[in-house]
């Protein structure tokens, strides 16, 4: 590790195979916490390269616990986190909204590392028991149209660095990696990123894959469509900037999207959205993220139709019923 750190301190970049080997060594416990923290710190001080990102991703996917749910052609809706905004669990709520609209979803998530509550925290608040058993995950897809994959069960390297990430409490390159390493390798993905350079990096990375994708970024720094500002959506060969008003939404204030101070607070907000008692801003931000996920699956549909499908799922109670069935089956 000493030689690797010297190389990085001298502003050199890692090759793809080199990055892959480093992540494998982290997962195998070959480096101590101080060495891993030093490595992470390097990537806080400069942008990660495409070769480095792909190498780290290669390692995680090679070491993953594989799960084959390809017959469902599922979508994952996931953000990098690390935007410092402490929003409620928008992407998780959007997942249940999309599932309620009839589209299969495989949500890959984790505990919050830089925020109060990650997707796994919300699931635990509902009594969900995590599993890596393919038959149980397949049954969840068949019965509820959604399955949840708790990242540490499927990616040993993510489990190994979890205490270090929590202690650092700032975004790291593992934030960038999380959305890229869903062990199912879903057919579709809606990915949220916290800055424009990462949007371009993700777009470039996904152009080499078979996954149909869209990458979103709100221009005021959110790693999802926040409706607080204009936002960019990038797909293979296309980028477009939208305003909330152009889609029929009022702009939100940042305070309206706050996730609270505890996992219990975040779970209450999540439940209010699912039950239809949340504020207009909270519901709208879930609807718009769900709509763009539906658009990834059905690119022929106008975005207005996708918004209508997402709204109907949330406001009719289909999303709530999907959550209820999911909790009953997986509790």
UniProtKB/Swiss-Prot annotation:
Its cofactor is Mg(2+). Anthranilate 1 binds at residues 79, 110. One of its GO terms (biological process) is L-tryptophan biosynthetic process. It holds the Pfam family Glycos_trans_3N. GO terms for cellular component: cytosol. The keyword Metal-binding applies. Mg(2+) 2 binds at residues 223-224. This is Anthranilate phosphoribosyltransferase.
